[in-house]
Design a protein with these regions (language model features):
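Catalytic phosphate/metal-binding cores of nucleic-acid and nucleotide-processing enzymes, i.e., regions
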Residues: 1-114
Length: 114
C-alpha cells in the first residue's frame, strides 16, 4: 500500500474487526465506496440491531468530524446505531476509545423503547 496513512487506517480497522469478532460478534469490513461509504465495519449485535462502525487512527482526535462522518454513513446504511472507534496511541486494541451518541447509549442500556 503506497499511502502510509491509509495503511495505518486499514491496520486499525482490521485490529478492531478481529477484536470484535473474538467476542463472537457478527462483524464485516465494508469495501471503500467513496461518497457512498457506509462505514468501515458493520456489525449485528446480540439483539439483531445493525451498527455502523467508523474507525480512526489519527494523531489528532476530531470527535465532531468523526461523529458527523459516522452519522452520514449510518443514515446511508439505514443502521439504527453507530460508533466511532478511535485508536489510543501506544495502547492495545482493547484500550481504544468508543464514542457513541447519548441517545444510542441510552437505547442500548435501557429496556425502554422510544
Amino acid at each position: 500500500m503506497a499511502n502510509p496513512s491509509k495503511a495505518k487506517g486499514t491496520d486499525w480497522e482490521m485490529r478492531v474487526l478481529r477484536f470484535l469478532a473474538s467476542y463472537g460478534l457478527d462483524v464485516q469490513r465494508m469495501p471503500p465506496a467513496g461518497s457512498l461509504d457506509v462505514g468501515d465495519l458493520q456489525l449485528t449485535d446480540k439483539d439483531g440491531d445493525r451498527w455502523v462502525i467508523e474507525c480512526k487512527a489519527t494523531k489528532a482526535i476530531d470527535l465532531a468530524g468523526g461523529m458527523n462522518e459516522l452519522r452520514v454513513e449510518q443514515q446511508r446504511a439505514g443502521a439504527p446505531f453507530g460508533a466511532l472507534i478511535i485508536k489510543r496511541r501506544n495502547h492495545d486494541t482493547s484500550r481504544g476509545y468508543v464514542v457513541i451518541d447519548l441517545g444510542d447509549f441510552a437505547a442500548t442500556v435501557s429496556d425502554e423503547v422510544l
